[in-house]
């Protein structure tokens, strides 16, 4: 049962081949057996899962149906879950039980999804390797000595190891797409505002977006259907109708214009990855797509702009964790200032502290114009480059990452080296565009992803292109040895 996709599970439940309770028990046993190898979960919710599965089976018995009804999933541990620890991978929130469900959690629960647990992540979603979690690093099921990507590494590793068919994740600078690439999954970052951020603990509010991680585009369509939609509780949520993503997976790629930015294939890209990306392009050409070279001239400025804007927003968002209202509080503070300093110093890890410092510096009186304002101007240029490109093409294609997954600890002492791994993904966050990563092959036994970007609210187009590609390739069906 553990090898089934979400779509296969939906068919199996509808045909009464097994019950949601049976499936849930099977996967919980598998998690208990295998997760100690990869450390993908922070919290397991066995009792909740079994009660939700039982309720889903009863709903089916009463004639209800639905692709997510009785389907097991997990949530990245920054989505608030009522009465269940929501840690954000941090000592700071190790004791925090949210008083309410995030909109994404509530919507999926209403659709009948079964929550198996909360997945590990880089602390406060800051990282590209899932090594900054207070609960320990997550290991890549394809090679346990390598990182799974971050910050949604727990969700990615759990799905890749077949512990469950799909999971929620978030993407601020590539945190869905990069782990998807590193673990041979399909991951989608929706348009900014497509999925509610209410109850999703913020890292950088103008960049964060929730989305699905699964093995196939078909499964991403099912999970996104349950996550997307307008939410009046989120002031950045956009009131745009949500199409039927699964029904849209049947479109022909004949005449589809795919833009390939020349900047993507400059120095820094592993030549073996470049070859796999070119193979993907040939496959899409066979399906009728037309390839056109384009330019994104301001892409080279994206990383410095992102690493000013994101930490600046983080320094503001994380100021609420002060040892007073909720979260970690130091012992025996001498006075209020000591309480603040020690609670934050002891509660936050080194990467989070680094980004808070960078952000506070960029926002300080003497440097605001030089850094933050300039970064926002670059953000506008990056967005304009995409608008120009999408006048000529329907989709933009390139690598998801410049390199395959690196070894655990390999970039820990050099944060800038890790930041540079985000070069292909952060532009979509700066511009607010939807982006998808799908499996494209392997380098030294490690998975490689190809990234697709589309205009605003064209998630359906991304999913259809990925689905047609997956009907004609088998990379996404490969399973890591031992899982």
UniProtKB/Swiss-Prot annotation:
Domain of life of the organism encoding this protein: Bacteria
Its GO biological process terms?
A: translation
GO molecular function annotations of the record: ATP binding; glutaminyl-tRNA synthase (glutamine-hydrolyzing) activity
| Positions of the catalytic residues | 76, 151, 175
Q: What class of enzyme is it?
A: ligase
Keywords per UniProt: ATP-binding, Ligase, Nucleotide-binding, Protein biosynthesis
Q: InterPro entries in the record, alphabetically?
A: Amidase, Amidase_CS, Amidase_dom, AS_sf, GatA
Give its E.C. classification number: 6.3.5.7
The record's section on PROSITE patterns has:
AMIDASES (PS00571)
Give the reactions, separated by semicolons, that this protein catalyses.
L-glutamyl-tRNA(Gln) + L-glutamine + ATP + H2O = L-glutaminyl-tRNA(Gln) + L-glutamate + ADP + phosphate + H(+)
| Gene Ontology CC annotations of this record | glutamyl-tRNA(Gln) amidotransferase complex
What function is annotated for this protein?
Answer: Allows the formation of correctly charged Gln-tRNA(Gln) through the transamidation of misacylated Glu-tRNA(Gln) in organisms which lack glutaminyl-tRNA synthetase. The reaction takes place in the presence of glutamine and ATP through an activated gamma-phospho-Glu-tRNA(Gln).
Q: Which HAMAP family match?
A: GatA
Q: How does it assemble?
A: Heterotrimer of A, B and C subunits.
- Family assignment from sequence similarity: Belongs to the amidase family. GatA subfamily.
Protein's recorded name: Glutamyl-tRNA(Gln) amidotransferase subunit A
């Amino acid at each position: 049962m553990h090898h089934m996709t979400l779509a296969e599970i939906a068919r199996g439940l509808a045909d009464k081949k097994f019950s949601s309770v049976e499936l849930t028990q099977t996967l919980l046993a598998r998690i208990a057996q295998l997760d100690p190898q990869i450390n993908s979960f922070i919290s397991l919710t066995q009792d909740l899962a079994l009660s939700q599965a039982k309720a889903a089976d009863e709903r089916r018995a009463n004639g209800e149906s639905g692709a997510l009804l009785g389907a097991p999933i997990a949530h990245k541990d920054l989505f608030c879950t009522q009465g269940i620890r929501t840690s954000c991978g941090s000592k700071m929130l190790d004791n925090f039980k949210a008083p309410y469900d995030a909109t994404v959690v509530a919507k999926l629960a209403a659709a009948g999804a079964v929550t198996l647990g909360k997945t590990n992540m880089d602390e406060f979603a800051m990282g590209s390797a899932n090594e900054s979690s207070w609960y320990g690093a997550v290991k890549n099921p394809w090679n346990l000595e390598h990182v799974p990507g971050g910050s949604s590494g727990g969700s990615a590793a759990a799905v890749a190891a077949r512990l469950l068919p799909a999971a929620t994740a978030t993407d601020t600078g590539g945190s869905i797409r990069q782990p998807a690439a590193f673990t041979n999954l399909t991951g989608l970052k929706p348009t900014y505002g497509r999925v509610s951020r209410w109850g999703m603990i913020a890292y950088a509010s103008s960049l964060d977006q929730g989305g699905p991680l699964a093995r196939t585009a078909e499964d991403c369509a099912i999970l996104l259907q349950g996550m997307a939609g307008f939410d009046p509780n989120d002031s950045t949520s956009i009131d745009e109708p949500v199409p039927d993503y699964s029904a849209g997976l049947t479109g022909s790629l004949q005449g589809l214009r795919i833009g390939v930015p020349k900047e993507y294939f400059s120095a820094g890209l592993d030549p073996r990855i470049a070859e796999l990306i070119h193979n993907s392009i040939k496959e899409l050409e066979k399906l009728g797509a037309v390839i056109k070279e384009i330019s994104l001239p301001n892409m080279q400025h994206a990383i410095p702009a992102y690493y000013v804007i994101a930490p600046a927003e983080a320094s503001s968002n994380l100021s609420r964790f002060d040892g007073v209202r909720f979260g970690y509080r130091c012992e025996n503070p001498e006075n209020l200032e000591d309480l603040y300093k020690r609670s934050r110093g002891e509660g936050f890890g080194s990467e989070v502290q680094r980004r808070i410092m960078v952000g506070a510096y960029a926002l300080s009186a003497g440097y605001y114009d030089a850094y933050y304002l300039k970064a926002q101007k670059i953000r506008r240029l990056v967005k304009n480059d995409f608008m120009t490109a999408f006048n000529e093409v329907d989709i933009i294609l390139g690598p998801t990452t410049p390199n395959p997954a690196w070894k655990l600890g390999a970039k820990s002492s050099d944060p800038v080296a890790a930041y540079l791994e985000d070069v292909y993904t952060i532009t979509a966050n700066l511009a607010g565009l939807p982006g998808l990563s799908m499996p494209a092959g392997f380098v030294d036994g490690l998975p490689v992803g190809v990234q697709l970007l589309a205009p605003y609210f064209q998630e359906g187009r991304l999913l259809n292109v990925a689905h047609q590609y997956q009907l004609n390739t088998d990379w996404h069906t490969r399973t890591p040895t031992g899982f």
